[in-house]
Structure formats: structure tokens, C-alpha cells
């Protein structure tokens, strides 16, 4: 079974978010960790705290094109950067875009019209977009309906940033499940182990994982870790899905653990 981590971060400089490790994480360490945990591939999500993180990710792809792909970013509030999207997928390993809106300046963008130009252009160019959308899940449904050929994936099952404990983490779950009716919306089940307060195998998470699987199915639910903020091992993040969930097995397990996300972002298997 091919195992593909749907979200990792690499960075060489800058001040990481408080819930991530505070030292750089480079491709050499990531590859060693992946090999130790049995991870075949990983999709790099360049970080905004390192302004050169897109190029760092491209360097990783050039060195290891069979191991890494990228969901990159650019400054959405700088009009001069908008032209970059037209040739975005011409960059090595660049499979899509990923954005999050954590600072006060950007939190209103999904609703105030700032991003209205982005959705039709990404749809036209067939560029998948991944969003940290916990604060605007209903808005994602509106975008998906208006742009039915735009592929949208929701980071971390819609869990708000820096949340701890399953009850708090899954308070948006009804809003997330409501998006399953849109065939162009998928869910990244990334970083889930980091929300558990109970020990491995994190039984507090299992019901929500099952409900998301039942709603979205194996082709629109993607396993991953966001490994640099996990309090458990990469291997435990794997076996949470491959061993601890009795309802996830066979071809469905293979899809969730990597094949489905590769298909979603058109990363050749």
C-alpha cells in the first residue's frame, strides 16, 4: 500500500507558529523521518513564516521528484502577484494552492470579496485549492456551488487552529459534513492525532473520523499528519488509520492513505 502524507511543512527560517516545532525542518530530515515511518510520498505545504518556502519546496521536488509534491502559496493581497497563477502548475512539483487566514488582516478575505477573483481563475486552470477554512465552512459550500469544477480540500477536517480535545476540535463537524453534498469538496484528515488528549490509539477521535468517512467516502478523505506539530510519532499517525479503525480496510484504506489525494491533485502514481 502506497502511503502519502497529504500535508507536511518544510522551512529554513522565520518564526514558526507556536504549535509547531521551533527549529527548521528541511528535506533531508523529512526524508529520513519518512523512511523510518514507511511514508512513500509527502505533499509539502510551504509556510508563510518563511517567505522563501515555495522555493525550498521546489528544491526538494527537484532532488526527489518521486517523494515530494507541493501545494504552494502567494500573497493574495498583492495584485501584482495574481499573474503568477496563470503559470502556477508549470513550476516543478506544483500541484495546487493552499491558503490559511490566521492573522486579523486576512480573516475577512473569504467573505469580503478579496478572494472573488481567485475561484474562477483556479477553476479555469484546474488548480486544486486547499483551505484552512474552519472559520468559514458555510462559505466554502457557496464557493463550491458557484464553481463546480474547482477542487477544494478542507485542511484538518475543519478543526480550528491550536484546538485541543475532541469535543472542542469537532465543534464544526456538522458544518463540515454538510459540504459532502458538493462533489468538488474533499477533506484532509490531517493533523488529527494532535487534537487528542487521550493516549494512542486516540479513541476520542474515532467517531468523528468515521462520520467524515461515511459522508465523503474514500475518494474524498485524505490521510496526513502536519507532522511538525504532532505529539506522537509519524508511525503512530499511520497506524491510527491502518490498524486502529476496524471499519477502514481493503481498497478503501488504500484510497484514504494516499491514492485518493494523488488522484485529486493529479500526482501520477
Labelled PLM ranges:
Residues 22-33, 54, 78-89, 171-172:
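Short, acidic/polar
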Residues 51-135, 142, 188-192:
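Active-site gating/metal-coordination segments in enzymes
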